[in-house]
UniProtKB/Swiss-Prot annotation:
S-nitrosylation is induced by interferon-gamma and oxidatively-modified low-densitity lipoprotein (LDL(ox)) possibly implicating the iNOS-S100A8/9 transnitrosylase complex. The modification N-acetylalanine is found at residue 2. Belongs to the annexin family. GO terms for cellular component: axon terminus; cell projection; cytoplasm; dendrite; endothelial microparticle; external side of plasma membrane; extracellular space; intercalated disc. The keyword Repeat applies. One of its GO terms (molecular function) is phosphatidylserine binding. It comes from Rattus norvegicus. There is a cross-link at residue 27 (Glycyl lysine isopeptide (Lys-Gly) (interchain with G-Cter in SUMO2)). The modification N6-succinyllysine is found at residue 288. This is Annexin A5. Gene3D superfamilies: Annexin. Annexin repeats lie at residues 13-84, 85-156, 168-240, 244-315.
Amino acid sequence: MALRGTVTDFSGFDGRADAEVLRKAMKGLGTDEDSILNLLTARSNAQRQQIAEEFKTLFGRDLVNDMKSELTGKFEKLIVALMKPSRLYDAYELKHALKGAGTDEKVLTEIIASRTPEELRAIKQAYEEEYGSNLEDDVVGDTSGYYQRMLVVLLQANRDPDTAIDDAQVELDAQALFQAGELKWGTDEEKFITILGTRSVSHLRRVFDKYMTISGFQIEETIDRETSGNLENLLLAVVKSIRSIPAYLAETLYYAMKGAGTDDHTLIRVIVSRSEIDLFNIRKEFRKNFATSLYSMIKGDTSGDYKKALLLLCGGEDD
């Protein structure tokens, strides 16, 4: 199934008229949140950037700053995220995951494991332009051990391109993983890192099938048994992303909402970052793999203007 987002360019777009609607929604007493959320969720990111430019031209004011002073809570966070230029959004999330005391490994793992080599190259460039530092250096400074090594391998963005599959190499890699884990006292983490971090996607899908045949285990079961902590989470995220990026992100969204409390940071990040890439596919995978739809789960787990905006971005129910 071809990848598609839920948010596209609005036809008949008029940035100046939109800027006027937003100014009116925030001027005077009270704020018209409905006008803001209905308008911004129906525009692509590129169009939102144009609206912000028109807003500054017409009123001499910064649209995002105005919204920050008028809106609050999760709804404010969501709207501010929608206004970040797409190419900077992942870089921004990574920067914040690395900033200050403590590292948000969950964010590092999710973004670096699920982005394609092309996307990772663009993220590295945006990060350097925006923050004046090298993403890989910052990651190395904030992580350690095999977890750090796997992140560095992925950040090289040198995964083999998808070409004709070499069955002999598939067999060799599957055997090497079996020997590095299940057949060994201890684990040869480097073998897992090299194979999972550098082989092509189509090759690895075949390796996972072959691994099941020779070992009797899914590769995920072996990773679960043989590794732990951040490295385990990263290797599992890579394997799941190799199998299907939309399925991995659907699972990420599911666990952000399942049980008590909601991980709103993850919910906002995945919905916003994928809304123009593959959120439609993520929705389909969500419906297929869980006993509910993404739309229903958001509806039951969030409230107010925040809920309204997320549902509009989600783009519909999947029965």
